[in-house]
Amino acid sequence: MYCRMEFNFFMNDVVQMARKEMVESGYDQLTTPEEVDEVLKEKGTVLVMVNSVCGCAGGIARPAAAYMKNYDKKPDRFVTVFAGQDKEATARAREYFKGYAPSSPSFALLKDGEIQMMVERHEIEGHEPIQVVQKLEKAFDQYCS
């Protein structure tokens, strides 16, 4: 029982640090299905980062997400949902990612509520952050003003 409590405290710290990293990078955290709908139904472009506690999220996806806030062309909104934590919000966001299997970490670029492109876990895990950045830059160039 003691080990389980220690593990839970450790995981809570990991989750809080992962959340904090995204918020400090300038992403709005969506924690409810209602918040997801409110943002994703808006006109304009939105980058959704599906956050997670796995190593490729911390070592690749979150650094790429932070970097993209400084790119010349940007979506209107940068938001994040947290897979495995805010389960209902994440499930609702994934309803907008038509044609893509659930994957975390991942990035989805939407325009006027419609999915335009996705960077899935298999395109993140085992890759360098710059490779993820390049995919996102290409999408921003194509879909963002």
Swiss-Prot record:
GO BP annotation list:
cell redox homeostasis
UniProt organism field:
Halalkalibacterium halodurans (strain ATCC BAA-125 / DSM 18197 / FERM 7344 / JCM 9153 / C-125)
This chain belongs to which protein, by name?
A: Bacilliredoxin BH2759
Q: Which Gene3D superfamilies match?
A: Glutaredoxin
- Taxonomically, the superkingdom here is Bacteria
Mind telling me which PANTHER family this protein's record contains?
A: BACILLIREDOXIN BRXB, UPF0403 PROTEIN YQIW-RELATED
Show the taxonomic lineage: Bacteria, Bacillati, Bacillota, Bacilli, Bacillales
* Similarity section: Belongs to the bacilliredoxin family.
Q: Name one Pfam family in it.
A: Disulph_isomer
